[in-house]
Swiss-Prot record:
UniProt key word Cytoplasm: yes
GO molecular function: GTP binding; GTPase activity; guanosine tetraphosphate binding; translation elongation factor activity
This protein's name: Elongation factor G
Principal place of residence: cytoplasm
Region (Disordered): 290-309
Biological process annotations from GO: ribosome disassembly
Cellular localization per UniProt: Cytoplasm
Gene expressing this chain: fusA
PROSITE patterns: G_TR_1, G_TR_2
Length: 705
C-alpha cells in the first residue's frame, strides 16, 4: 500500500499546558475543526473526547496522553491536506512522567497558556522538559475572553520567566467581554470568526483604526525575527524594509525548528476563536518528522547508530505508552521513526532480547479506533497483542537491530500499603497492580518481606489515589490503603571508617570461613556521577596478592549490595556510600561464597553504625500561588511545615511562593491549603533532593521502623 500523505506534510505535536489553561478544550476544538468530532465535547460537562478515562472526566484534569490522528487543509481550505498526530499531555505535576513520555516521541509542541494566569509554576516544569528534548514549540494564549485577560503580559512572562524569544504572530482585537478576533500580522488583516457556524467560517476585515499602530509595531518585530534567520533575508530586509509573506514564514520556521524563537498565537478555544489560525501556524511553523535530526540509538555492538525518517530505512519505533483496554486487552502506543510495519509482522525488542508478532495495528482517535494494515515512518499508532513490552522499549527490524535512547524515569517518593477488602480479591489485585505498573514506570509495586503487605509507590498522593481508583473501576478490586509513607534514605557522614568481621563456624565436617576488612566513606559528588556507581553505591576492590582469592570478591560485593537495600537505621535503602575492600583472609577448605557474603554484610552493618549514620528525607520544591489576602497564613504554614522560603514572584492571581518543604510535612496539604485560602490558592510540587533529617524526625522514624 502506497503512502497517502507525504512525510513532509506530517505534524506530530503535543498540546502542553498548566492545569486550567484550557488545554483539553483547545484539543477538543482541534478535533472539531479538523472534522474528527461532530459535536464539541465540553470539559464542563465531563464529555471531552481526549479525556477518556472516567476519573479524568470526573476530575476535569487530563491524566493519560491520548494520541489522535486528524487532517487539516488550512483555515481557508487552500493548503494540501496535512496529517496531524496529536498527543494530549497532562499538566499535573504528579504526571510529569506522562509529559516526559510524550515529549520523547513528539516533533513539536503547542504550549497553551491562560491569558489571565499567564506562566504558572507548572508551565516552567513542562517547559524545562521540552528544552531537555529540544522540542520546537509555539504558544497559544487562550481564554482571551476571560476577565483579566492580558496578551502582552503573558508574552512578557514568556520572555522573563521561561527565557523564550517570544514572537507574536497576531495581536488580539479587544479582550475580556470585548474580545472579537485577532489581527493576522502576516496579512495585516483582522480575522473575525463566525459565531453561528461555531467558528468554522471567517472573514478578513480591515484592522480597527485604534490597533493600526500596535499591529505595525508588532509586525516589524516579527519581520525582524524572521530576517535574523539568514544573511540573505537580513540583507533584503535592510535594503527594502520588508519581506514577503513567504519569506517571513520560511525565516520564522527555520528559527522555530532550531528552538531559537517561540511564535505566539492567541484566542479563546471556548468561544471558538483563534484555534483555527493556530492550526495554520502548526503547518507553517512546526516540523515534520523529516525536519528533525535522524533518531539516535546504539547497534548490537554498542556503537552509535541513526535511523533517517524514510520508508526505505530499516524499521525502528519506540513504545511510549502501554494501556489496558477493556475490549482488546493490552495496547502498545508506538511512534515509528523509520521504515514500515505491516500487521502480522515480527518485530524485535532489543531491550528484552525478544521477538514479538504484531497482531492488529490500530489508528487511535482518542478512545475510538480504526484498524489499519500498515504504518510508516512518522506514524503514531497502537499495536494489539505485544506481550512483553514496557514503556520506553524499542521495537525494530530483526536484521537491523538498534536500541533507541531509553527514557529515564524518576524514583518514586511516596509509598503506601494496600490490601484488598476481601481475601478473594488478592489474586485479582496482584494482576491489576502488575498491569498498572507495566503502563506506568513511575509507579512501583513490591511486597514487604516482614509484614507481607503489598506496598505501592509513586510520584505523589494524587498519583496513588488515581491508581487505587483505577483498580476499583477497571479491575473491580476494592482496596483499603494505609497512610502514605515517605521514602527516606540512609547514609553516613564519617570517612575512612574501618570495619573488620570474621565469619567462622567450625563444628566438625566442612565449616564456614570468611574474613573481610572494609573501609566506609561517603561518596563525593564527582564519584556519584562515575559510571562505576550502581544504585548510588560504589564498591572498590583494593585487595592485592591473593589475600582473598579472586573468585570470592564478587560474593563480597553481592553481600554488600544485598545489605544496602535495607539500611541499619530504619530499614531504608542506603545511598551515597563508598566501600573499599582492603584486607581479609580465607581458609583453603572452609571458605565459600556464602561465608564471604555473610562476612561482608556483617562488616558493613558494624561499620555503618560507627560512621555517623544519618537519615535523609526527600525535600520537595513547592510552588504556591495565593491571593495576597491569605499570604500571611500560607507563609506561616510553610514555616510550620519546616519549609525554607526561596523567594516570591508576582502572579495575576496574587503571589507565587517558592519553598523547599520536606515531603513528610506535605501530606494532606491540598486540603489544608484549600481551607486556609477558601479554595483560591493552588500549589504544585516536585521532588528536588534528599537532605539530612533533623534528630527528632530521625528518632520518630527509627522508633516506628
Amino acid at each position: 500500500m502506497a503512502r497517502t500523505t507525504p512525510i513532509e506534510r506530517y505534524r506530530n505535536f503535543g498540546i502542553m499546558a498548566h492545569i486550567d489553561a484550557g488545554k483539553t478544550t483547545t484539543s477538543e476544538r482541534i478535533l472539531f475543526y479538523t472534522g474528527v468530532s461532530h459535536k464539541i465535547g465540553e470539559v464542563h460537562d465531563g464529555a471531552a473526547v481526549m479525556d477518556w478515562m472516567e476519573q479524568e472526566q470526573e476530575r476535569g484534569i487530563t491524566i493519560t496522553s491520548a494520541a489522535t490522528t486528524a487532517f487539516w487543509s488550512g483555515m481557508d481550505k487552500s493548503m494540501p491536506q496535512h496529517r496531524f498526530n496529536i498527543i494530549d499531555t497532562p499538566g499535573h505535576v504528579d504526571f510529569t512522567i506522562e509529559v516526559e513520555r510524550s515529549l520523547r516521541v513528539l516533533d513539536g509542541a503547542v504550549f497553551v497558556l491562560c491569558a489571565v494566569g499567564g506562566v504558572q509554576p507548572q508551565s516552567e516544569t513542562v517547559w524545562r522538559q521540552a528544552n531537555k528534548y529540544s522540542v520546537p514549540r509555539m504558544a497559544f494564549v487562550n481564554k482571551m475572553d476571560r476577565t483579566g485577560a492580558n496578551f502582552d503580559k503573558v508574552v512578557e512572562q514568556l520572555k522573563a520567566r521561561l527565557g523564550a524569544y517570544a514572537v507574536p504572530m497576531q495581536v488580539p482585537i479587544g479582550a475580556e467581554d470585548g474580545f472579537e478576533g485577532v489581527v493576522d500580522l502576516l496579512k495585516m488583516k483582522a480575522i473575525h470568526w463566525d459565531t453561528a457556524s461555531q467558528g468554522t467560517t471567517f472573514e478578513y476585515r480591515d484592522i480597527p483604526a485604534d490597533l493600526v499602530d500596535v499591529a505595525t509595531e508588532a509586525r516589524s518585530f516579527m519581520v525582524e525575527a524572521a530576517a535574523e534567520a539568514s544573511e540573505d533575508l537580513m540583507d533584503k530586509y535592510l535594503n527594502e524594509g520588508d519581506l514577503s509573506e513567504q519569506e517571513i514564514l520560511s525565516g520564522l520556521r527555520e528559527r522555530t525548528l532550531k528552538v531559537e524563537i517561540v511564535p505566539v498565537f492567541c484566542g479563546s478555544a471556548f468561544k471558538n476563536k483563534g484555534v483555527q489560525a493556530m492550526l495554520d501556524g502548526v503547518v507553517h511553523l512546526l516540523p515534520s518528522p523529516a525536519d528533525r535530526p535522524p533518531v539516535q540509538g546504539i547497534d548490537e555492538d554498542e556503537k552509535e547508530d541513526t535511523r533517517a525518517a524514510t520508508d526505505t530505512a530499516p524499521f525502528s519505533a519506540l513504545a511510549f505508552k502501554i494501556m489496558t483496554d477493556p475490549f482488546v486487552g493490552s495496547l502498545t502506543f508506538f511512534r515509528v521513526y523509520s521504515g514500515t510495519l505491516n500487521s502480522g509482522d515480527q518485530v524485535y525488542n532489543p531491550v528484552k532480547s525478544k521477538k514479538e508478532r504484531v497482531g492488529r495495528i490500530l489508528q487511535m482517535h482518542s478512545n475510538n479506533r480504526e484498524e489499519i494494515k500498515e504504518v510508516r515512518a512518522g506514524d503514531i499508532a497502537a499495536a494489539v497483542g505485544l506481550k512483553d513490552v514496557t514503556t520506553g522499549d524499542t521495537l525494530c527490524a530483526q536484521d537491523k537491530i538498534i536500541t533507541l535512547e531509553r527514557m529515564v524515569f524518576p524514583e518514586p517518593v511516596i509509598s503506601m500499603a494496600v490490601e484488598p477488602k476481601t481475601k478473594s480479591d488478592q489474586e485479582k489485585m496482584g494482576m491489576a497492580l502488575g498491569r498498572l505498573a507495566q503502563e506506568d514506570p513511575s509507579f512501583r509495586v513490591k511486597t514487604d518481606e516482614e509484614s507481607g503487605q503489598t506496598i505501592i509507590s509513586g510520584m505523589g498522593e494524587l498519583h496513588l489515589d488515581i491508581i487505587v481508583d483505577r483498580m476499583r473501576r477497571e479491575f473491580n478490586v476494592e482496596a483499603n490503603v494505609g497512610k502514605p509513607q515517605v521514602a527516606y534514605r540512609e547514609t553516613i557522614r564519617k570517612s575512612d571508617v574501618k570495619s573488620d568481621y570474621k565469619h567462622a563456624k567450625q563444628s566438625g565436617g566442612k565449616g564456614q570461613y570468611g574474613h573481610v576488612v572494609i573501609e566506609l566513606s561517603p561518596m563525593t559528588e564527582e564519584e556519584r556521577k562515575s559510571e562505576n556507581v550502581k544504585d548510588d553505591f560504589l564498591f572498590i576492590n583494593d585487595i592485592t596478592g591473593g589475600i582473598i582469592p579472586k573468585e570470592f570478591i564478587p560474593s563480597v560485593e553481592k553481600g554488600l549490595r544485598e545489605t544496602i537495600t535495607s539500611g541499619p537505621i530504619a530499614g531504608f535503602p542506603v545511598v551515597g556510600v563508598k566501600v573499599k575492600l582492603v584486607f581479609g583472609s580465607y581458609h583453603d577448605v572452609d571458605s565459600s561464597e556464602m561465608a564471604f557474603k555473610l562476612a561482608a554484610s556483617m562488616a558493613f552493618k558494624q561499620g555503618f553504625a560507627k560512621a555517623s549514620p544519618v537519615l535523609l528525607e526527600p525535600i520537595m520544591k513547592v510552588e504556591i500561588v495565593s491571593p495576597e489576602d491569605y499570604l500571611g497564613d500560607v507563609m506561616g504554614d510553610v514555616s510550620r511545615r519546616r519549609g525554607v522560603l526561596q523567594g516570591q514572584d508576582d502572579s495575576p492571581s496574587g503571589k507565587i511562593i517558592n519553598a523547599m518543604i520536606p515531603l513528610g510535612e506535605m501530606f494532606g496539604y491540598a486540603t489544608s491549603l484549600r481551607s486556609m485560602s477558601q479554595g483560591r490558592a493552588t500549589f504544585s510540587m516536585e521532588f528536588d533532593h534528599y537532605e539530612e533529617a533533623p534528630a527528632n524526625i530521625a528518632d520518630a522514624v527509627t522508633k516506628k521502623g
